[in-house]
């Protein structure tokens, strides 16, 4: 139990409440406060099951924290390895191939992934859209001279046409124009 002493101001001659008026001397005002440790449902500290401070309220987890990199299986834009991508580029295709070089920690890459998902819905069977994680495929990204993220490669099914490369977040309309007019 902790006792906290509070002094009253000398200019206050009239009591503020019936409780304060029952006190004999203004300087004898004591506020009693009990401080009890709160039991936490989990603890991340190695010092035991006590929270960081006796006044700290425990947090409740709404869902488990994410563990590692996670790519959903129901995404239309599939993650490929370097070897799978090279086989796809060398194979026969009738539709353009869009390759997204991204990183999971990159904010613009996350925004680009949303736009590419919308693009994959619109060009369902008229384009193949894949992505490559530059953290997992570092050497391949270096060989492809990926300097900024996100980097997109638009590869035409016609081998005589050069690939179109973009760096940074580009609007959805620009991707439409490249696929419709340049491929």
UniProtKB/Swiss-Prot annotation:
GO biological process, one term: cell redox homeostasis
EC number per UniProt: 1.8.-.-
Site feature (Deprotonates C-terminal active site Cys) residues: 100
Site (Contributes to redox potential value): 107-108
Keyword terms: Chloroplast, Disulfide bond, Electron transport, Oxidoreductase, Plastid, Redox-active center, Transit peptide, Transport
Top EC category: oxidoreductase
Keyword Magnesium: no
Location in or out of the cell: Plastid, Chloroplast
Residue ranges constituting the Thioredoxin domain according to the UniProt record: 82-183
PANTHER family the UniProt entry points to: THIOREDOXIN-LIKE PROTEIN CITRX, CHLOROPLASTIC
Protein family per UniProt: Belongs to the thioredoxin family. Plant CITRX-type subfamily.
Protein name: Thioredoxin-like protein CITRX, chloroplastic
Organism: Arabidopsis thaliana
Taxonomic lineage from the root: Eukaryota, Viridiplantae, Streptophyta, Embryophyta, Tracheophyta
